[in-house]
């Protein structure tokens, strides 16, 4: 069995506005192993995105904890969480969030710049990742000059440029047509095999989720079942 990379222990999240309390997550517990490909399946409003924010240290749980590589997130300072996100975690969103005035190469290089890598390393590594996603020939193009599928591939290259241990992906194919969505999931699987990166993908699409090695279902802020989607139609 692979070493546990990330573990959730009874995560709860409650928002309060005035006298109104809204419970978004209820005692969520699960783990992700090194190199694992996992999907969390649920409809809009089920709590999937809130969960990813907690896993990435972008928000704080009301109770419970997230443990990454044996280290509780609750014990980390804001600076330590930021360093963790830069070095060990990657993020992919439904919208690519590329910087419009920068080229594909410059967008991919951004996490390396933040991590204060050497200039020569920054350029070579960013170009290496663009090649890995099949876009080295588009390195000097801005996002407005790329197709939707190409923009998402650049976003994936950016998420993986620092060799993270785990990538958190929030509906990564939600804005793509079926052909491009299929291409993106094939790419994630290939990067998992080549680099050993673990992926945790939240999605509402069963056809896409079945490509992952493990699937959990979320309803109304609760993990309700482990699914078996092999051969799902």
Swiss-Prot record:
Cited Pfam families: ABC_tran
GO terms classed as biological process: lipoprotein localization to outer membrane; protein localization to outer membrane
Gene3D superfamilies: P-loop containing nucleotide triphosphate hydrolases
Binding site for ATP: 42-49
Keyword Phosphoprotein listed: no
Top-level taxonomic group: Bacteria
Record carries keyword Transport: yes
PROSITE patterns: ABC_TRANSPORTER_1, ABC_TRANSPORTER_2, LOLD
Predominant location category: membrane
EC number: 7.6.2.-
SMART domains membership: AAA
Membrane topology: Peripheral membrane protein
Subcellular location: Cell inner membrane
Residues of the ABC transporter domain: 6-233
Record's keyword terms, sorted: ATP-binding, Cell inner membrane, Cell membrane, Membrane, Nucleotide-binding, Translocase, Transport
Enzyme class: translocase
InterPro entries, per database record: AAA+_ATPase, ABC_transporter-like_ATP-bd, ABC_transporter-like_CS, ABC_transpr_LolD-like, LolD_lipo_ATP-bd, MacB-like_ATP-bd, P-loop_NTPase
Any one of the GO CC terms: plasma membrane
PANTHER family named among the record's database cross-references: IMPORT ATP-BINDING PROTEIN, LIPOPROTEIN-RELEASING SYSTEM ATP-BINDING PROTEIN LOLD
Chain's role: Part of the ABC transporter complex LolCDE involved in the translocation of mature outer membrane-directed lipoproteins, from the inner membrane to the periplasmic chaperone, LolA. Responsible for the formation of the LolA-lipoprotein complex in an ATP-dependent manner.
Subunit organization: The complex is composed of two ATP-binding proteins (LolD) and two transmembrane proteins (LolC and LolE).
Protein family membership: Belongs to the ABC transporter superfamily. Lipoprotein translocase (TC 3.A.1.125) family.
NCBIfam families xrefs: LolD_lipo_ex, PRK11629.1
Official protein name in the record: Lipoprotein-releasing system ATP-binding protein LolD
Gene that produces this protein: lolD
């Amino acid at each position: 069995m692979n070493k546990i990379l990330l573990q959730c222990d009874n995560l709860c999240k409650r928002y309060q506005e005035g006298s109104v309390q809204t419970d978004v997550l209820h005692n969520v517990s699960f783990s992700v192993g090194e190199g694992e490909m996992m999907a969390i399946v649920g409809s809009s409003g089920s709590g999937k995105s809130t969960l990813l924010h907690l896993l990435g240290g972008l928000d704080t749980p009301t109770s419970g904890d997230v443990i990454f590589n044996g280290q509780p997130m609750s014990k980390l300072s804001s600076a330590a969480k930021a360093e963790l996100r830069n070095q060990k975690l990657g993020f992919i969103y439904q919208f690519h969030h590329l910087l419009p005035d920068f080229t594909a190469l410059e967008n991919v290089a951004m996490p390396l710049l933040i991590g204060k890598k050497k200039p020569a390393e920054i350029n070579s590594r960013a170009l290496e990742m663009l090649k890995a996603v099949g876009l080295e020939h588009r390195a000097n193009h801005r996002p407005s000059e790329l197709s939707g599928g190409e923009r998402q591939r650049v976003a994936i290259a950016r998420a993986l440029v620092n060799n993270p241990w785990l990538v958190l992906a929030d509906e990564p194919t939600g804005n793509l047509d079926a052909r491009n969505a299929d291409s993106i999931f094939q790419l994630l699987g290939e990067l998992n095999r080549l680099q050993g990166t673990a992926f945790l993908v939240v999605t509402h699409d069963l056809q896409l989720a079945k490509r992952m090695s493990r699937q959990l279902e979320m309803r109304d802020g609760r993990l309700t079942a482990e699914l078996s989607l092999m051969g799902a139609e």
